[in-house]
Amino acid sequence: MGMYTGLRFKGTVKEEFRDSFEDIAMHGRWAESDDYMFYAFGCDYRASFIPCGCLAYMPEEWEIESIDRKYAIDTDGFDRTYDKESGRWTFQCSLKNYDDTIEKFLNMVPYFVEDVEHAEVFYEEWDCSEKWELIDGKMVMTNDKFVNYTHSDLGFC
């Protein structure tokens, strides 16, 4: 059946991309973009799951559940939002990362994002998530024991 990997993201889209980025930010329409980099990423089978993949097998701390799953509330400000004026983009999602879709996304982030406030990756069988940061024009994994989701106190690993 396959395992899920989650991604939580908060960042600022570069000004030159802001006007045309809303369909991607809110609907995952990478392949419909006129920008070649976005289009090429959109050709990945699971690209639209970023940012639109619903959470599956992610830590309970990532959302407040509801009786009806579609009404669950994202926590910590990771609900899917995009502000065209400021470029602020937030989301959390999960997907089966068979083709390294998340890694492809992270590699592309420096192309269209000027600032990353939070980038976190969590594989459903891990105890701890990874923290990623934008450093010198590259996304770099800076902490492979970022948040421990196996303990009720939610401390660092």
Model feature map: region roles:
Residues 27, 36-40, 44-157:
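Charged interaction segments
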